[in-house]
């Protein structure tokens, strides 16, 4: 009986050790995946404004042409959310560029940001809706 108890204890210890190694490896793999792949980033209007001032970014307005013409962030490129499908948008030729995406309220910008990531863009930041933009807007014409 003592021998069976020792055998059981050794087996349990081996099993615990092996499963611990497997869990540790899975965590490492997940961390590597996260650094290798592009990820969705939600930021505030203030953070987006700071990024615009301090680095080279492409500001992407995913609203309709009418909404864009009514007032948009200066230098924003119009790429309506509905136009983003399985093809890379012509207005966004560089998949390595840092994209700052916005719409009116934040719903379309999230959807568009996720579609752009799926198309292979690497650095996509959603800063929500223009209704939360405390800075100046420009109008065409």
Go through each PLM region and give its residues.
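Structural scaffold elements adjacent to functional motifs in cytosolic proteins
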Residues: 59-61
């Amino acid at each position: 009986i003592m021998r069976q108890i020792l055998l059981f204890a050794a087996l349990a210890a081996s099993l615990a050790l092996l499963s611990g190694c497997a869990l540790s490896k899975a965590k490492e793999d997940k961390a590597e995946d996260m650094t290798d792949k592009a990820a969705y980033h939600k930021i505030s209007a203030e953070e987006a404004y700071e990024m615009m001032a301090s680095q080279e970014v492409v500001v992407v307005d995913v609203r309709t042409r009418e909404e864009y013409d009514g007032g948009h962030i200066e230098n924003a490129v119009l790429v309506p959310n509905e136009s983003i499908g399985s093809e890379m948008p012509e207005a966004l030729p560089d998949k390595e560029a840092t994209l700052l995406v916005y719409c009116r309220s934040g719903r379309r910008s999230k959807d568009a940001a996720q579609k752009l990531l799926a198309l292979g863009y690497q650095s996509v930041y959603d800063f929500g809706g223009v209704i939360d933009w405390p800075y100046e807007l420009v109008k065409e014409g």
